[in-house]
Design a protein with these regions (language model features):
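Intrinsically disordered, low-complexity regions enriched in small/polar residues
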Residues: 43, 68-69, 82, 358, ...
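Active-site hotspot residues in diverse enzymes, especially metal/ion-binding acidic/histidine motifs
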Residues: 1-348
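Short, charge-rich, low-complexity interaction segments located
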Residues: 73-76, 346-370
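Short linear interaction segments
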Residues: 364-396
Length: 396
């Protein structure tokens, strides 16, 4: 990819991920460039000057070199769940943002030695009928040694199995998305499951389980992908044998108090639990419809009693702080990844390096000369190289 194409690709994606029009970008840059010029940059017909490139970098809070660096991965969206009224502009913004975030995660994986996504079970579970989702959910639980107990943290479990959980600010019409980052020979490097910020914990958990279904299921022709993914998600959160044991194999009635207890137990909404009972033929179709009308009348579709707190991702913060502590990325890069100011002490290596650079030039030369003499003596004596792990060597 040429410099022009790389800049064009990066610029357009950044603009769309921020939901900016060309006019809005011109305004945010203080009108140092015209809308027509920006359009040419995005089409690869012209390159911005160094001054304009630096202004773009300041506007988007990235380094200028970001625009010149070729993407190491491309992102494919293998599951996109949205309302029909979601505009193309909103869809482009969401996809651009997810692409940007997932590329950053892949880079962070690489620099910290985190396993890539070659081993992920992408489309590994083939189903030909809706009931096969029960088997697929059970197989995945077995492969991941999860047992049959309810999953206490969906986010933590997914991150333990190298699947990124990404929360974004999105309009109400957005439900979720599943994406895979692949390298130049289409080997998977990472997967991401995306949900909206600000949703309840039970909705977040089912949304993640639903998107996990899009990721791992190979759905046969003629099957409704959304229904299959939903059934898989419910089966993954509430395995059939556990539901039969704790709720029963046949129920003519069930109390709302019971459902609220099971809501906490399985981390699922009352509405999703009632549907689960119907799918497992524990309740009749008539009784299922009765509960759906009751949920509508109580307005529980909008807000249920006993809402669970949304789960929080730990991988990004933990890994970004590790990379910062090891001197692999700067404070500004950490803040860009986390989207917030960093309130931690500077790593000792950075403090030492800055203290060293403040010394007079002659003093720095003396220290470096002494270190060079020590190394020369070390090698001439045939010392074991493992000894280099000890001692106070100053980076410069």
């Amino acid at each position: 990819m040429s410099n022009s194409n790389t800049i064009a690709h990066r610029l357009k994606r950044l603009r769309m991920s921020r939901g900016l029009s060309l006019d809005a970008l011109v305004a945010s840059m203080g009108h140092v460039v015209t809308k027509q010029a920006l359009s040419k940059y995005e089409c690869g017909k012209a390159n911005p000057s160094p001054i304009v490139l630096n202004k773009l970098a300041d506007t988007f809070k990235v380094k200028a070199s970001y625009f010149l660096r070729e993407p190491q991965v491309s992102v494919k969206f293998i599951g996109y769940r949205k309302a029909s009224s979601l505009s193309r502009k909103d869809q482009d913004r969401i996809e651009s943002l997810v692409t940007e975030v997932l590329e950053d995660r892949v880079n962070l994986q690489a620099m910290t030695g985190w396993p890539n996504g070659n081993h992920l079970p992408i489309h590994a579970h083939r189903i030909s009928k809706i009931e096969d989702t029960e088997r697929a959910a059970e197989e995945l639980r077995t492969n991941w040694t999860l047992g049959q107990d309810p999953i206490s943290s969906m986010v933590g479990m997914l991150e333990d199995h190298h699947i990124h959980v990404i929360e974004i600010d999105a309009i109400d019409k957005f439900d979720g998305i599943c994406a895979v980052a692949v390298d130049e020979v289409t080997r998977s490097q990472a997967a991401g499951l995306v949900t909206s910020k600000g949703v309840s914990g039970e909705r977040q958990r089912l949304s993640l389980a639903h998107e996990l279904g899009h990721l791992v299921l190979k759905i046969g022709s003629g099957l409704d992908e959304e229904k299959a993914a939903f059934r898989f998600g419910a089966a993954f959160l509430a395995p059939a044998q556990v539901v039969y044991r704790e709720i029963g194999t046949k129920r003519d009635t069930i109390l709302s108090e019971e459902l609220l207890l099971f809501k906490k137990r399985f981390g699922m909404s009352v509405q999703a639990l009632v549907r689960r009972l119907f799918d497992l033929k524990i309740i009749s179709e008539g009784y299922y419809r009765h509960w759906m009308m009751l949920i509508n009348r109580l307005k529980w579709k909008r807000k249920e009693p006993g809402e669970l707190e949304p789960e929080q991702s730990q991988w990004l913060r933990q890994t970004a702080l590790r990379a910062y502590a090891e001197g692999l990325i700067t404070r500004e890069e950490v803040e860009g990844l986390l989207g917030e100011p960093l309130d931690v002490e500077e790593p000792l290596t950075l403090i030492e390096r800055r203290a060293f650079m403040k010394l007079p030039l002659e003093e720095r030369r003396r220290i470096l000369s002494e270190q060079a003499d020590k190394l020369k003596s070390h090698y001439s004596d045939g010392a074991d190289r493992s000894d280099l792990q000890n001692g106070d060597f100053v980076e410069h």
